[in-house]
């Protein structure tokens, strides 16, 4: 059975989007990631798109989503990737296991910062999810 992981942050424009793509790329088909934000931005950050493309990953169909849009999906685990999302994490219809794994927010920084965060997500989050 496929495990579904919700990756949650505030804007759903940088870290959670990169984490969604990395999890689906590295752990699919056993794990399916979806991402959302507590206050989603209008679009995915250009730096996040570029960092993912540089890593050879598809960015087709990425867009910021409000956590309410995924609230009724089957979720096995919630991963918060920023402190604000942890603090304002919504109450789900059923209790869910959750982990908090914060990453630096590269929004507004050079592409190198996005690449660094992408690599850190891969180095820390992927092994954690493999163990679960």
What are these regions (language model features)?
Residues 1-68:
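Conserved active-site segments centered on acidic
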Residues 35, 80, 99-102:
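Structural signal for conserved beta-strand scaffold positions within catalytic alpha/beta enzyme cores
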Residues 49, 77-79, 105, 124:
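Alpha-helix boundary/capping detector
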Residues 62, 68-93:
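Mid-chain, well-packed structural core segment of small domains
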């Amino acid at each position: 059975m496929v495990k579904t992981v919700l990756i949650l942050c505030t804007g759903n424009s940088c870290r959670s989007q990169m984490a969604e793509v990395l999890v689906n790329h590295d752990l699919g088909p056993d794990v399916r990631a979806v991402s959302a934000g507590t206050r989603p931005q209008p679009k995915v950050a250009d730096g996040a798109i570029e960092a993912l493309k540089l890593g050879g990953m598809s960015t087709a169909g990425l867009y910021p989503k409000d956590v309410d849009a995924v609230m009724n999906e089957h979720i096995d685990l919630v991963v918060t990737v920023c402190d604000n999302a942890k603090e304002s994490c919504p109450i789900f219809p059923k209790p869910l296991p959750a982990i908090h794994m914060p990453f630096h927010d590269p929004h507004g920084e050079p592409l190198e910062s996005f690449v660094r965060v992408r690599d850190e997500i891969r180095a820390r989050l992927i092994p954690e999810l493999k163990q679960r």
